[in-house]
Amino acid sequence: MAGLHSVAGEKINRGLLLTPQDNYQVALDLACEQLLNSDLSERSAKSGAVLEKKESGKELIKITFLNQICEIKLPSMEMGCAGSEEEMPVWAKILILHYLNHSQGLPLSGKWITFRQLPGGSGYYPAHAKRTLNPLINAFGSNPEFLIEAAKLLGGRAVLLGDAAVTIFAFPHVPITFILWKGDEEFSPEANVLFDSTITENLSTEDVEVLCQMVALKMKKWAMS
């Protein structure tokens, strides 16, 4: 299962140097092609999306992503969020398509795992700590209760873990739990992220890392507003 940056590595190995924007565009193009060549009814059913067929013969996929209804027009592959005129970030388009392309539709296991327990998670962990955990600590370490308010914008709900914790359904089959422990004179604030073990059947570890980073930044933005 290719992640957001994997395509660039393949191109560089072939002697083609890509800019970050090139990398994302290649990944986006490949993900679009894969979805168009798939059984759309099956992909929609497994991912928890809705496939609508228009009178014109064109189709529309609707998928919940971070508490928003996102739409994909087929076969043009135009993507956007319902009720918003803002251009969807390319990283969001890629994550949505990767989820649609790879979700196996398994029921949640109820077994929580840490980032390090994901395939190759130990290798990605330094980036995860820098881009997800540290921003959460900086934004909410002194006031963990604010995390609960920030998460409401993303459809999050409070859970009884740590000093404050929230579970956010990034996608229909992808709950992510963010946990904070408040610091004191002896200990620094800490943060952790837990996933249902079935996340490996929906997204690559690289995609999970990017997804967590973006959720953390959205909540941090709320805290700074």
Where are these regions (language model features)?
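Amphipathic, interaction-prone secondary-structure segments
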Residues: 45-75, 157-182
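Short Lys/Arg-enriched alpha/beta "domain-start" segment
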Residues: 2-59, 92, 99-154
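Intrinsically disordered, low-complexity regulatory segments enriched in Ser/Thr/Pro
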Residues: 68-94, 181-206
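Domain-length accessory/inserted modules outside core catalytic folds
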Residues: 121-133, 161-162, 200-204, 211, ...
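Conserved binding-pocket/active-site segment within a compact domain
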Residues: 138-201
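Ampiphathic alpha-helical segments that act as solvent-exposed interaction surfaces
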Residues: 1-2, 85-109, 196-225
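Short, well-ordered helical secondary-structure segments
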Residues: 83, 87, 123, 127-129, ...
